[in-house]
Amino acid sequence: MIEFYFNKKRRLITPNDFNYVFKSPNVIRCKEITILGRLNLLSFSRLGISVSRKNVKYAYQRNKIKRLIRENFRIIQHRLVSSDFVVIVNSSSMQISFKLLAKKLENLWSYYYQ
């Protein structure tokens, strides 16, 4: 049975988790979003999100973007290679609709499919 959970074990939480990905990442990017990925030794993928106040001014917009990224990851996580991912949102992400942002995110995830 496929699990569509996004619980605490599927998140990158500590600075060491993020630094592990930043050391030698596999980078996929578009103008609005950058995904850094690195293989892990676990049997599942984990996600970390970085949306800075400098790039997205208002908190409600940052939260909406993070919810969109988490939901997108939750649905496709079983198709991904067992890796740790950090999604970085750029300032140009606010110049397009959330629907288009979700489509671009899906296209970027496809590079990491098994």
From Swiss-Prot:
Keyword presence, Hydrolase: yes
GO CC annotations on file: ribonuclease P complex
Catalytic reactions of this protein: Endonucleolytic cleavage of RNA, removing 5'-extranucleotides from tRNA precursor
PROSITE patterns named among the record's database cross-references: RIBONUCLEASE_P
Pfam families documented for this protein: Ribonuclease_P
GO-annotated biological processes: tRNA 5'-leader removal
Subunit structure of this chain's protein: Consists of a catalytic RNA component (M1 or rnpB) and a protein subunit.
Full protein name: Ribonuclease P protein component
Source lineage: Bacteria, Pseudomonadati, Pseudomonadota, Gammaproteobacteria, Enterobacterales
Gene name of the record: rnpA
